[in-house]
Regions:
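Short glycine-rich anion-binding loops that position phosphate/pyrophosphate groups of nucleotides
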Residues: 41, 102, 173-175
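Active-site phosphate-binding strand-loop segment of PLP-dependent enzymes
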Residues: 141, 147-175
């Protein structure tokens, strides 16, 4: 028999399951429920997107890309941002493309956080932020927004939580 307490790291053993999972379990047992959970679309992927994926596969584009993502995609993102906002980012040095948002968040936090660094996390927010901070040795610090502030961060809320150990602010949007 495997002793999971010895196999699994202490950092992972102390992680509590996400509370949203309880809602998923309840919703899965009900009919005609619209989930407002983790942002999964309730529609089928549009045909033009599926067709583009099929075409890419047919052209043999099935290999790993550069760690920072496809060069042509990074360039297109850079051009789109510049066109829509007037802000210029270098597609080679300042833009990366990940397989999903969670991976990008994880990479960013791992890159910036040292053991003991505090990370301010404005809530409500996506459930993975605090566990990733903890796994990186950081200290998640919740900054709760309320209905009274229309779930917006105020300067006072921020000042109240900032310390000498604060290294990062996670500011979810929309919030």
């Amino acid at each position: 028999m495997i002793d999971y307490d010895k196999l699994i790291s202490e950092k992972c053993r102390v992680m509590k399951p996400s509370g949203i999972r309880k809602f998923f379990d309840i919703a899965a047992q009900m009919d005609n429920v619209i989930s407002l959970g983790v942002g999964e679309p309730d529609f089928q992927t549009p045909w033009n997107v599926r067709q583009a994926a099929i075409t890419s596969l047919e052209k043999g584009k099935t290999k790993y890309t550069a760690n920072s993502g496809l060069a042509e995609l990074r360039k297109a993102i850079s051009e789109n941002i510049r066109k829509n906002t007037g802000i210029s980012y270098c597609d080679n040095d300042e833009i990366i493309v990940t397989v999903g948002g969670s991976e990008g968040i994880d990479i960013s936090i791992r890159t910036l956080i040292e053991s003991g660094d505090e990370v301010l996390i404005v809530e409500p927010c996506f459930v993975c932020y605090a566990p990733i901070v903890s796994l990186c040795g950081g200290v998640p610090v919740s900054v709760q927004t309320t209905e009274e502030t229309q779930f917006r961060l105020t300067p006072e809320m921020l000042r109240e939580k900032i310390t000498d150990k604060t290294k990062l602010l996670i500011l979810p949007f929309p919030n």
